[in-house]
Amino acid sequence: MRQDDLKLLGKIVTTHGIRGQLKVASFSGEFDTILSLETVVLKGKDGRMETFPVARATVHHDRVLLSLTPFTNINEVLHLISAVSYAHRDQFPPLEEGEYYWCDLIGLQVVTAAGTVIGRLDSILPTESHDVYVVRGADREYLIPAVEDVVVQVDLEAGTMTVSPPEGLLDL
């Protein structure tokens, strides 16, 4: 199994209860993708990757509780704490037009409508009103609001995001 065929989801932070449930912290802050999975791939501290069927997934506060087959008690899952979770992209639920998974946006080259390269989309900060794209340029970092007026086009095929930043935004 090639790791580049997988998309990063989150990390196992601890166990929950005595029946072998695992608490997953989602890196994107959204849960629907993890809740819809039939299988999950876990990469342990030793770098080894294993695929497990998902028996059950539920939201618990700000985490997802995963029950994986064949585990039924806490002692069987202790070695999975701190494992990083991945899933095959084809398991993700479909999105509406104009919606994107974070994992598809990270790494895009960000350019202005005039064609000036700003940098690469490095990470995404979730906020109450909208996400903020962290773009790493040659000599600095830019914070670009993920709003319709600023993000003009996303072209996943070309690997680009075109933005029309308000005057002064790139000077901050």
UniProtKB/Swiss-Prot annotation:
Entry annotated with the keyword tRNA processing: no
Domain PRC barrel: 97-169
UniProt cross-references to InterPro entries, sorted A to Z: PRC_barrel-like_sf, PRC_RimM, RimM, RimM_N, RimM_N_sf, Transl_B-barrel_sf
Keywords: Chaperone, Cytoplasm, Ribosome biogenesis, rRNA processing
Cellular component GO terms held in the UniProt record: cytosol; ribosome
A GO term, aspect molecular function: ribosome binding
BP GO terms, sorted: maturation of SSU-rRNA
A Pfam entry, by short name: PRC_RimM
SUPFAM superfamilies, alphabetized: PRC-barrel domain, Translation proteins
General function of this protein: An accessory protein needed during the final step in the assembly of 30S ribosomal subunit, possibly for assembly of the head region. Essential for efficient processing of 16S rRNA. May be needed both before and after RbfA during the maturation of 16S rRNA. It has affinity for free ribosomal 30S subunits but not for 70S ribosomes.
Record-stated family: Belongs to the RimM family.
Assembly and binders: Binds ribosomal protein uS19.
Domain writeup: The PRC barrel domain binds ribosomal protein uS19.
Protein's recorded name: Ribosome maturation factor RimM
Gene that produces this protein: rimM
